[in-house]
């Protein structure tokens, strides 16, 4: 009975922790004409937007739904571990070149598409703007009138030889449930060459599941504090609902239905794509997915940025009755933002949640999420939560030296869990 009571206590704590809205900055689109924002480090579309200091490149792509040229500029700000702007540094302390007033000059118009758009591409670092130190960065893209259009968040980590060591492991025999619905992360941190005398103030940590910021775990207290590092074991803060495999579809042309698509039609004005109706998942069934990631591409895999059209994608989730809270489509391509354009409406006649989202041709993985009345995310009941679910966990470690002026990103690792 004592064990059951303990597990119930952990579940109550988990219910709160899982759904707490993260205070971190996330990519944000502020101009309604902007679509298909992609932020990719080192050409790895499955990874977080993190590059190594002095090595690697961050590519930012987006479309403006017009053929009119708009002059977009950008500014770069360094942020602390909690994503608040760093106030103790001058621009020259963190940027080589110029932190503000730089223009995006790589511009192309769409070709042979029903939806006309202008494609913009920016790479960081470049000839006029290069990050000089590690940490979090906020890049704001704005128009000629000074109105913010896009906010992009990315990270720069210390080189591998100057990083702390991070080890991750995942167990399904958790302090909440045993081989049922949860996964618990165990983490170990080695300081290596860093001088840490007060880890409570010098070390900050973030643990994410599938790159999601809405259920990220911030600065969990470690169970073990050692002279050379920290260890988190059986930590209630590191218990996650396992969820289920992400759903997915791929649209490579406006003519042929491909993976996950039941049919495509043209209504005289727009192309429409209909993913297969999402039925309730009563059991776990492995299905390889990309954990929310997306990739713009077309059937020719040629000029994908300017010759890929847009489709009106009709999402439909079968559900016997409405659930408490609002239901959203969620993936990397929604930027963990629960906005009206990703919200689903319940249709009594078909007993399903439905919404239509305009998307560019490509591969998309996604999940259905409930946002409760307190603004916290929950598992969609029809999707289920199974301990076998393949999830990827990411750990970020920040360090501030004694008397230091800012937080450095000194550790990052990613661990993919696969049930045996």
Describe the role of every protein-language-model region.
Residues 114-142:
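Ligand-binding face of N-terminal immunoglobulin V-set domains in extracellular IgSF glycoproteins
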């Amino acid at each position: 009975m004592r064990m059951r009571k303990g597990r119930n206590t952990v579940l109550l704590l988990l219910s709160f922790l899982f759904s707490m809205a993260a205070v971190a900055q996330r990519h944000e689109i502020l101009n309604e004409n902007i679509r298909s924002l992609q932020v990719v480090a080192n050409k790895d579309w499955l990874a977080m937007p993190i590059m190594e200091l002095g090595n690697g490149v961050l590519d930012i792509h987006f479309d403006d739904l017009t053929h009119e040229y708009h002059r977009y500029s950008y500014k770069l700000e360094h942020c602390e571990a909690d994503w608040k702007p760093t106030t103790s540094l001058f621009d020259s302390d963190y940027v080589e070149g110029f932190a503000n007033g730089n223009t995006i000059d790589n511009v192309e118009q769409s070709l042979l598409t029903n939806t006309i758009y202008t494609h913009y591409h920016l790479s960081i670092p470049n000839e006029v703007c290069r990050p000089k130190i590690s940490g979090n960065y906020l890049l704001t893209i704005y128009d000629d009138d000074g109105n913010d259009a896009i906010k992009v968040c990315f990270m720069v980590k210390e080189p591998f030889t100057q990083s702390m060591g991070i080890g991750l492991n995942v167990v399904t025999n958790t302090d909440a449930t045993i081989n049922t619905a949860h996964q618990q992360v165990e983490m170990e941190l080695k300081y290596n060459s860093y001088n840490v005398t007060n880890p409570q103030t010098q070390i900050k940590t973030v643990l994410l599941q599938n790159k999601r910021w809405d259920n990220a775990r911030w600065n969990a207290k470690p169970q073990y504090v050692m002279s050379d590092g920290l260890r988190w074991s059986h930590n209630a803060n590191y218990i996650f609902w396992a969820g289920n495999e992400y759903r997915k579809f791929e649209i490579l042309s406006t003519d042929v239905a491909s993976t996950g698509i039941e049919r495509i039609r043209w209504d005289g004005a727009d192309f429409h794509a209909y993913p297969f109706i999402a039925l309730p998942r009563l059991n776990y069934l492995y299905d390889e997915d990309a954990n929310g990631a997306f990739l713009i591409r077309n059937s020719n895999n040629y000029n994908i940025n300017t010759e890929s059209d847009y489709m009106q994608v009709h999402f439909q989730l079968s559900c016997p009755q409405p659930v408490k809270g609002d239901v959203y489509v969620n993936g990397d391509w929604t930027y963990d933002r629960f906005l009206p354009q990703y919200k689903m409406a319940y249709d009594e006649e078909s007993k399903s949640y439905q919404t239509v989202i305009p998307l560019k041709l490509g591969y998309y993985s996604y999940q259905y999420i409930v946002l409760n009345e307190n603004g916290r995310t929950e598992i969609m009941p029809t999707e289920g939560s199974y301990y076998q679910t393949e999830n990827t966990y990411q750990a970020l470690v920040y360090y501030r030296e004694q008397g230091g002026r800012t937080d450095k990103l000194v550790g990052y690792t990613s661990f993919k869990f696969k049930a045996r």
